[in-house]
Amino acid sequence: MTNQKPSRRESILQALVELLQSDPGARITTAGLAKTVGVTEAALYRHFPSKRKMFEALIEFAEEAVFSRCQVILQEQEDVRVRLQQLSHLVLVFAERNPGLCCVLTGDALMGEDESLRKRASQFFERLETQIRQALKEGEIRQGLRPRTTAARGADFVMVFVEGRIQRFVRSSFLRLPTSDFDEAWGLVSEAVWG
């Protein structure tokens, strides 16, 4: 079995994520990124026409990685409580394994960038919330598991938990892991959603 060398495009994205992880909150310049990758800025632009396209590629990677697995969970699990627990855990594990990407998804790395890019990043969480809301509605119909309040408010509560854990991870410079004490914390979330 041979290990394939990553493409230049993948190397650029990997270097960008590593820069975001090693210096959270710092503004990334194409000159600094080119230096890290070991290429010229012109070489960066051969693969990405703009820094925006680099960030969009990272967001697309996160969406593909998370939502393809979300679909598997939604298809395999019947119980809405298990579905939501696994969906939440999946996102938090992904965040923990990809700290630099968390800076993009939370918008921290996008400060000073085009506002439409921040909106693009927020679509990740909006899409997740939609899936959670839909799962809550299906749980009510198929299992008779009615949330204490509406499906929209239940989904909002789950999202506050997930996004809060990811935001805390970024704010702590990746020291406070989003999955720490997950089972205990999820028990409290579950209690709040269903009673």
Curated annotation (Swiss-Prot):
Family that this chain belongs to: Belongs to the nucleoid occlusion factor SlmA family.
Gene3D superfamilies, per the entry: Tetracycline Repressor, domain 2 (1.10.357.10)
Cellular component annotations (GO), alphabetically ordered: bacterial nucleoid; cytoplasm
Residue ranges of every copy of the HTH tetR-type domain listed in the record: 6-66
Gene designation per UniProt: slmA
A GO MF term: DNA-binding transcription factor activity
InterPro entries assigned to the protein according to its UniProt record, in alphabetical order: Homeodomain-like_sf (IPR009057), HTH-type_TetR-like_transc_reg (IPR050109), HTH_TetR (IPR001647), NO_SlmA (IPR023769), SlmA-like_C (IPR054580), Tet_transcr_reg_TetR-rel_C_sf (IPR036271)
Superkingdom classification of source: Bacteria
SUBUNIT field: Homodimer. Interacts with FtsZ.
Binding region for DNA: 29-48
Subcellular location: Cytoplasm, Nucleoid
Species of origin: Marinobacter nauticus (strain ATCC 700491 / DSM 11845 / VT8)
Name this polypeptide is given: Nucleoid occlusion factor SlmA
